[in-house]
Amino acid sequence: MNSLLFLALVGAAVAFPVDDDDKIVGGYTCRENSIPYQVSLNSGYHFCGGSLINDQWVVSAAHCYKTRIQVRLGEHNINVLEGNEQFVNSAKIIKHPNFNSRTLNNDIMLIKLASPVTLNARVATVALPSSCAPAGTQCLISGWGNTLSFGVNNPDLLQCLDAPLLPQADCEASYPGKITNNMICVGFLEGGKDSCQGDSGGPVVCNGQLQGIVSWGYGCALKDNPGVYTKVCNYVDWIQDTIAAN
């Protein structure tokens, strides 16, 4: 991967210098249906994650954009029909108007579902932030992305990772000149645990609120290169206004 360029991998958090390193590494298998807001974006295969924020809208990363998406909800094993899933096609897919595919600033996208989903114990919404979370807040990251830092192991079962929101100064020091005010770092400077390919667009939930969207990083789970996430608290007005207008 060109170290001078960001590469938005289809179905992946943007990661370099290693293409195959964007997944949840060092996490654990989530308890079945314990993450009812987690969705899988599918175009014949799982390519990104997302979060259900009301019965007809999903939020994901803009670098996951495709013209047609099937949203799969109530999933745990994405390769087996378990009987609890709901599959709904997209009606509208709206990238943030200021999304920059080179810098990945404003890496956020809304998907309107063709019909409302049925909310239940296995399909539920996650709250938008009421305020921005402070550094040190413990968060939960989830996804079906690769589980290896080197090599590929795409899991069938949803994976989880508990990780702290890092100080912005540490985030900026890890990626000099790359971090905007719309980005946060979540994870471990010592490496070993991170999101990776296939997790992109998925949730970072802190104290029951969606504070982050899996966006990009340098490799996966590498020392001094924590995962970078879209700072959702900066976009609550845009989300609400866009939903109201559509």
From Swiss-Prot:
Gene3D superfamilies: Trypsin-like serine proteases (2.40.10.10). GO terms for cellular component: acrosomal vesicle. Residues 1-15 form the signal peptide. Expressed in the heart, lung, brain, kidney, liver, epididymis, ovary and uterus. Expression in the testis is limited to round and elongating spermatids. It catalyses: Preferential cleavage: Arg-|-Xaa, Lys-|-Xaa. Keywords: Autocatalytic cleavage, Cytoplasmic vesicle, Disulfide bond, Hydrolase, Protease, Serine protease, Signal, Zymogen. Residues 24-244 form the Peptidase S1 domain. It is an enzyme of class 3 (hydrolase). GO terms for molecular function: serine-type endopeptidase activity. The active site is at residues 63, 107, 200. Its EC number is 3.4.21.4. Proteolytically cleaved and activated by an autocatalytic mechanism. Cleavage by CTRC inhibits autoactivation. InterPro entries: Peptidase_S1_PA, Peptidase_S1_PA_chymotrypsin, Peptidase_S1A, Serine_Proteases_S1, Trypsin_dom, TRYPSIN_HIS, TRYPSIN_SER. The record marks 81, 122, 150, 193 as: Cleavage. Pfam families: Trypsin. Residues 16-23 form a propeptide. It is found in: Cytoplasmic vesicle, Secretory vesicle, Acrosome. Activated by autocatalytic cleavage. Cleavage by CTRC inhibits autoactivation. The keyword Signal applies. GO terms for biological process: proteolysis. Disulfide bonds join 48-64, 139-206, 171-185, 196-220. Belongs to the peptidase S1 family. Serine protease capable of autoactivation. This is Trypsin-5. It comes from Mus musculus. The gene is Try5.
